[in-house]
A protein has these predicted regions:
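Loop-centered beta-sheet repeat module
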Residues: 45-97
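Membrane-interface interhelical loops and short amphipathic "cap" helices
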Residues: 2-19, 67-86, 125-131, 188-198
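A contiguous, surface-oriented mixed alpha/beta subdomain in the mid-to-C-terminal portion of proteins
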Residues: 82-150
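Hydrophobic cores of alpha-helical transmembrane segments in multi-pass inner/ER membrane proteins
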Residues: 22-38, 88-104, 140-154, 202-221
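Membrane-interfacial loop-to-transmembrane alpha-helix junctions, especially the N-terminal start
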Residues: 44-58, 105-116, 160-172, 227-230
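Aromatic-anchored segments of alpha-helical transmembrane domains
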Residues: 1, 58-70, 116-128, 173-184
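C-terminal transmembrane helix-loop-helix hairpin of multi-pass membrane proteins
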Residues: 136-144, 151-230
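Membrane-interface helix-loop-helix junctions at boundaries between adjacent transmembrane segments
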Residues: 1-55, 72, 76
Length: 230
């Protein structure tokens, strides 16, 4: 699918969600899952497993590129407000879910940040032919996101807070929203376009994901003991 995108063979939403392409994606996920499940240590992740997780996350982001704010950024310029806000919240929740799942394997902060950096590098391929400046901007956003993830993971592993998984998941989702807001402001400045979104609207793109991220964090907690699931 990435190869077809680079060559311009297929564009738009429909090719991404056709059964044939979904089967290709499923095959990719199964191969990546094999690398993940056959890792030497079941208690931790090696570099191959980290790359597998990052690639799986990147594939999900690629499948949903039609509702990815970094790739569908013009929806913020063309006043498609519902789609624009929904894309940020959806992808922020996905970023939070990935954190809740991967952090249980005792990954280092560096490994966790690599998962997010690689996923951003994957989606930066999409606009690389026609809009190289956007590719660079997405890569920079990925670096900022990975730096924030590093700090969040470091805090998660050193704190004894009884709600650390929920707070961390909320911070991941909020960080995604914050990084995108910075990305949007940089994009509008570089391209000389006026944003219709005001300060409180942009602030909502950061605070709303915080709420959903906190709720997703409960998925990493045992409903009986209240402890983090391992």
């Amino acid at each position: 699918a990435i190869w077809h995108t680079l060559l311009g063979i297929e564009t738009g939403v429909e090719p991404l969600i056709t059964p044939s392409h979904l089967m290709l994606f499923l095959g990719s996920f199964l191969m990546l899952d094999y690398v993940f499940t056959t890792r030497p240590s079941k208690e931790s992740l090696d570099n191959a497993s980290i790359f597998s997780a990052a690639t799986s996350y990147g594939l999900v982001m690629f499948i949903t590129l039609f509702i990815n704010p970094f790739l569908n950024i013009w929806s913020f310029i063309e006043r498609e407000d519902e789609l624009a806000a929904g894309s940020v919240i959806l992808q922020a929740m996905l970023a939070s879910f990935i954190f809740v799942y991967v952090v249980r394997f005792k990954v280092s902060p560096k490994q966790m940040s690599l998962v997010y950096l690689v996923s951003f590098l994957y989606i930066s391929i999409n606009p690389s032919l026609g809009e190289f400046n956007r590719t660079i901007l997405i890569c920079i956003s990925g670096l900022i996101m990975s730096a924030l993830i590093y700090q969040i993971t470091k805090w998660y592993q050193t704190t004894n807070h009884d709600r650390k998984i929920q707070v961390s998941a909320a911070l991941v989702a909020g960080s995604y929203g914050l990084v995108f807001v910075l990305h949007l402001l940089a994009f509008s400045t570089l391209n000389g376009v006026d944003l219709s979104w005001r300060f409180y609207g942009l602030g909502g793109l950061v605070t709303t994901p915080l709420l959903f991220g906190y709720m997703l964090g409960n998925l990493g907690v045992s409903p009986t003991s209240g402890e983090v699931v391992r």
